[in-house]
Amino acid sequence: MIIGIGNDIIDIRRVQKTLDRFGDRFIERIFTEVEKAKSEGRRMRAASYAKRFAAKEACSKALGTGMRRGVFWKDMGVVNLRGGQPTMALTGGALERLKEMTPEGTEAVIHLTITDDHPQAQAFVIISVVPKP
């Protein structure tokens, strides 16, 4: 059963301008250590950060909160499953909100797709629940 859907699209050039203007201040405020390690190693650094930014926005929409009600940027981070598939790791207020949304006897699964085609990056998040084993 789907309990949340969110999407976001962002202009990579806007992220590049933000990186140029604010640099580490922007990165440290928004991104997790895992996200920074992934993005800093990429040739298309701004596109990598843009996809992750869009994923956070999409996830906050799927949670039904946006960036409020105790949900902060670093509470959500893009991580990869063993096979390489992206998903979101939640902590803090984002994790608390997910727990509130999840019906008893079920567990939440976060599906994420991220893509970029210059000048845009996009993310789509679906939060579903499945019965606990």
UniProtKB/Swiss-Prot annotation:
Keywords: Cytoplasm, Fatty acid biosynthesis, Fatty acid metabolism, Lipid biosynthesis, Lipid metabolism, Magnesium, Metal-binding, Transferase. The keyword Transferase applies. It is found in: Cytoplasm. It is an enzyme of class 2 (transferase). InterPro entries: 4-PPantetheinyl_Trfase_dom, 4-PPantetheinyl_Trfase_dom_sf, ACPS, Ppantetheine-prot_Trfase_dom. Its EC number is 2.7.8.7. Pfam families: ACPS. GO terms for molecular function: holo-[acyl-carrier-protein] synthase activity; magnesium ion binding. It comes from the Bacteria. It catalyses: apo-[ACP] + CoA = holo-[ACP] + adenosine 3',5'-bisphosphate + H(+). Mg(2+) binds at residues 8, 57. GO terms for biological process: fatty acid biosynthetic process. Transfers the 4'-phosphopantetheine moiety from coenzyme A to a Ser of acyl-carrier-protein. Belongs to the P-Pant transferase superfamily. AcpS family. This is Holo-[acyl-carrier-protein] synthase. It comes from Parvibaculum lavamentivorans (strain DS-1 / DSM 13023 / NCIMB 13966).
